[in-house]
Amino acid sequence: SKRMQTLFDGGRGDEFHIYYGPSGSDMMYWPLLMQSMLHPGQTITNIVSCPEELGSGSILAAEGMYYANTNQYGEAVPKGDLVTDSFHVDVQFLPAREISGHIADRKQAIRDIIAARPGQPIVGNLVFGSKSGIKDDLDIIDEFREGVMWVVDMCQFRTHPALVHELLSKGVMLMVTGSKFYQAPPFCGALLVPKFWTELLTGQPAEHLRDYGRLFTAADAPPDLPQLRSIWPDHPNAGLRLRWEIALDEMEAYLSIPQEETDALIRRWSRVVIGRLALSDRFGMMPDMELTNDSIISFTVSAGGRELDYDELKKLFDTLVLGEHPSLNGYNRVFLGQPVRYGQRSFIRLALGSYSIRKLMEPNGFDPYNDLHVVDLIERTAIELFES
C-alpha cells in the first residue's frame, strides 16, 4: 500500500485507501457493497459504461452475481447466481460504440438516468482506457459532485499519475490492475478509494455482506473497516500480494522515465504498426482511433473477401497464442488482445505494455521487427484458416 501511495499521492498516505480483490472484475462489487452499507434496504442504481469492452466478468459482477465458477480459495461457486439477496441492484448498461463502430456519446444518457432517480444511491462507472482504449468524458463527474459514487475503470492503467491524483482528489474511486499495461501476472486487482469514503463507512453495519466472504478475504478490506474483516475469512491471498509486488516493481521502473519520452515512443510505435496494417486490404482500422489511447490499436480482420466474426477471430486468436512462432526475433510465443464485440461485428487489438516500451527505449534503438512480424503472422494465419 505504501509503495502505491508513494507513486500516486507523493507518499503522503492520506489521500486514498486500497481495497483488494483477486481480479479487476471483483472491483465491480466494492462500490455496491459500500452503497449497501451507506443506504441499507434501498435499491442501488449501477450505471456501467462500455460493458462490452470491460473485463469478461464485469457484466455479471455489476449485477452482484458470481462471474466465475471458482473463487480465490479454489472453491466452486454458482456462476450467474446472486452473491447475496440482502440488497438489490438496478443496472443501466451504456454501450461503448454505435452500430457503425463509432464511439458513442454517453453523457446525456448518464444525465437522464441520474435525473430520474433523485435521492437514490447511484454508482456511476466510467472508463478511461477500455479494451480498445476508449476514454469517457470525465467532465460529467463535475456536473454531479454530490449524490453519485463515481468510479473510473482504469483497469488497463494506461494513464499518468497526475490524472490518478486529480480524480482521487475529486472523491472518485479508481479500479486498477497491474496485469495490463504494467504486464504483471494476471489476476491483480485493486480499488483506490479516497479516504473520506472509508471514513463514511466506519461504523456502518456490514453483517448483510457475510456471503461476500465467498469472494473476498479479511485482508482485502482495509484495517479501518473491522466490521468487514471480522465476517470474512482470515485467508490472506499471498499470490495476489506477490503479483502486486511484481506490478509495483514495473511501475516504479516505468514511471522513473520522463513522461514526454515514453509518450513519444508510444506515438512512434502506433504510427509504425498502423502503417503496416494500412498496407493490407485484410485489415480495417476501428473508427475514432484518435479518441482512444495510443498504446492500443484496434482493427478488424478480413479473409476470403469478408470480415471475420467474433467466433472466427477467437479461432484466429487461439491459433496464434497457443502456437509457437520461431520466426520471431528472440521469442517464440505471441499474445494479443482478445476479440471484442460491438453490435454484430468484432475486432482484435495489439497493445504496447510498459516493459515493452522500456525495451524499445534501450540503447540498441527502436526496433519494431517483432511488432510488425506479429501483423504478418495475423494476416498469414487468417489466410490459412479461412481462405484455404
Predicted regions and their residues:
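PLP-dependent enzyme catalytic core of the Aspartate aminotransferase-like
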Residues: P339-S388
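Conserved active-site segment immediately N-terminal to the catalytic lysine
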Residues: H165-S179
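Active-site C-terminal subdomain of aminotransferase-like
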Residues: S179-N293
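Active-site phosphate-binding strand-loop segment of PLP-dependent enzymes
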Residues: T84-V151, R158, F181
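Gly/Ser/Thr-rich loops at beta-strand to alpha-helix junctions
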Residues: Y19-Y29, P51-S56, F128-I134, C155-R158, ...
